[in-house]
Amino acid sequence: MMGGYDIMKRLVRRALQGGPDASFLFGSFIRKARYTFMIGIYDYTVVLTYCSLISASLGIIVCLHGIGHPFYGVFFLLLSGLCDTFDGRVARSKKNRTAMEKSYGIQIDSLADLVAFGILPGCIGIAMLRVSKRFSDVPHIRHVNPDDKLVLYPIALMIIVILYILAAMIRLAYFNVMEEERSHTENTARRYYTGLPVTSAALIFPTVMLIQFLTETDLTMLYFGVMVVVSFLFVSKIRVRKPGLKLILAMIAIGAVEFALLVFIHWRAGGI
């Protein structure tokens, strides 16, 4: 296989000899360098999945920065949900995908979903705990007296976060295995999911945050209670009908309304 230096030298020589234009040379170099230097897939079929992961990563950073900013974390959660809504359709639009590309798409989508809809909601909960007035008197674990029973509250809530992330991971791994087995026996599209899809977190938790802002009530405990319920639904054997186009559009509309209301409320509060 031709090395990276040889590729560059060949392209430069062709340019000096009056070969193709610079844009073609650059594109050719990128395509060849991609297979020479890097692993992975970088075409349009996975762009939205990568964007979802980037959005989730930013959400985690802002949630854990300083005292915590759960409000901004919810914005990134909604954005990740929007990317996830369309990434599958974009990937399937490429008709000549290889088996490796399809398998890669499934795996990378699940990994991104674990970060976006597993870890990020947990970080939002941690940020809510930090800014909650109800828990302002609860000491930090590293500063607490072992005999102080108040420390049990944050420990219990951290356990809920860990179990939630674990449930999301189990759900995604199970889905990948079942989807691979189904692809060998069925050619039709899936009609039902077993267990609640993890992407539902993109609408469930922003709703809790929206209610908190509308009612001006500290709903930190409710948020963690919802995490417990959702964790169970992730790994339950309930059958959830796969949403059709109308339901997908309805969920997009709900997410857009939640996003707009959160922006408006935060703007009225002088946060933007």
Feature-to-residue mapping (PLM):
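C-terminal membrane-associated helical module and adjoining short loops/tails
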Residues: 3-27, 177-272
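Interhelical loop and helix-boundary elements at the membrane-water interface
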Residues: 11, 28-53, 92-115, 156, ...
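Multi-pass membrane catalytic core of lipid/isoprenoid biosynthesis enzymes
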Residues: 47-50, 93-172, 209
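Core segments of transmembrane alpha-helices
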Residues: 51-56, 113-122, 196-209, 227
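Membrane-embedded alpha-helical segments that form the functional core of polytopic membrane enzymes
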Residues: 51-107, 157-165, 226
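Membrane-embedded alpha-helical transmembrane segments of multi-pass integral membrane proteins
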Residues: 55-58, 87, 119, 167-170, ...
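Structural signal for membrane-spanning alpha-helices in multi-pass inner-membrane proteins
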Residues: 56-63, 124-127, 171-174, 205-209, ...
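Juxtamembrane transmembrane-helix termini
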Residues: 62-65, 126-136, 174-181, 215, ...
